A protein has these predicted regions:
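Internal alpha-helical scaffold of NAD(P)-dependent oxidoreductase catalytic cores
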Residues: 116-123, 129, 141-192, 199-222
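NAD(P)+-binding Rossmann beta1-loop-alpha1 motif at the extreme N-terminus of oxidoreductases
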Residues: 1-40, 44
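Rossmann-like NAD(P)-binding element
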Residues: 46-98
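Rossmann-fold NAD(P)-binding glycine/threonine-rich loop
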Residues: 90-133, 137-141
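Glycine-rich nucleotide phosphate-binding loop and flanking beta-alpha elements
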Residues: 13, 71-74, 93, 130, ...
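Residues that mark the start of a beta-strand
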Residues: 2-3, 85, 149
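Short, hinge-like loop/turn segments at secondary-structure boundaries
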Residues: 44-48, 104-105, 140-144, 192-195
Length: 222
């Protein structure tokens, strides 16, 4: 894997792109407003980055990070994402996305609905439970004593392996949550959402070891 595509280049998307470039990856960024609006981000990221449309970013990426509001997930380019590992950073916020009965009733998860739309893409839920400032600040080299872990969920074991390697390269350990049906354990309002990484008003964050993240995931109640 050498190229990471980005559909959505807001706080989380841009932060992951910076970490990826620092780790030696090429990145192709996109947003809903067009490549020309990303000139500043591309300049900041440097020569390893270029801007494109969402479909082009999906086509170019060996893996693709999706970081758009949940309500926009049906606009994702399923054809270009077919068969690819997709990193889903999204959360369902009813006040922003409107109410979805299946999610309000707890009969499915936002990740499962996104997987349903994407078909053969291999979706991994990740990056949705950490503030972007903490994500930028807490990256550490492999083996660091204060390395932080992030939870991941997927129905595809090979996709988990791919994402684990990517997270390791950009500075994070991984805690496997289980299939997408268990991704509710890392959604807003659960113990692992935000809290292990420190208060939002502390931009440096607090390192959260794998054991602590695993315990927070296990403590979730639906």
């Amino acid at each position: 894997m050498t190229t990471v595509g980005f559909i959505g280049s807001g706080n989380i998307g841009a932060t992951v792109a910076r970490l990826a470039v620092a780790a030696g990856y090429d990145v192709v960024v996109s947003n809903s407003r067009g490549p020309e609006t990303l000139a500043g981000l591309v300049a900041d990221l440097g020569p390893a980055a270029r801007a494109a449309t969402a479909a082009e970013a999906a086509e170019a990426g060996d893996v693709v990070v999706v970081s758009v509001p949940f309500k926009a997930h049906r606009d994702l380019p399923a054809e270009q994402l077919a068969g690819k590992v997709v990193l889903d950073t999204n959360n369902y916020y009813p006040q922003r996305d409107g109410h979805v009965a299946e999610l309000d009733q707890g009969t499915t998860t936002s990740a499962e609905l996104e997987q349903r739309h994407l078909g053969t893409a291999r979706l991994v839920k990740v990056f949705n439970n950490i503030h972007f400032r903490h994500l930028a600040a807490l990256a550490r080299p492999a083996g660091a004593a204060d390395r932080t872990a992030l939870p991941v969920a997927s129905d595809d074991a090979e996709a988990i392996t791919t994402v684990t390697a990517f997270l390791d390269a950009i500075g994070y350990d991984t805690v496997e949550v289980g299939p997408l049906s268990e991704s509710w354990r890392i959604e807003p309002g659960t113990p692992v959402y935000g809290a292990p990484y420190g208060p939002f008003d502390n931009p440096d964050g607090t390192p959260a070891a794998a054991a602590d993240v695993r315990a927070a995931v296990a403590a979730a109640r639906r």
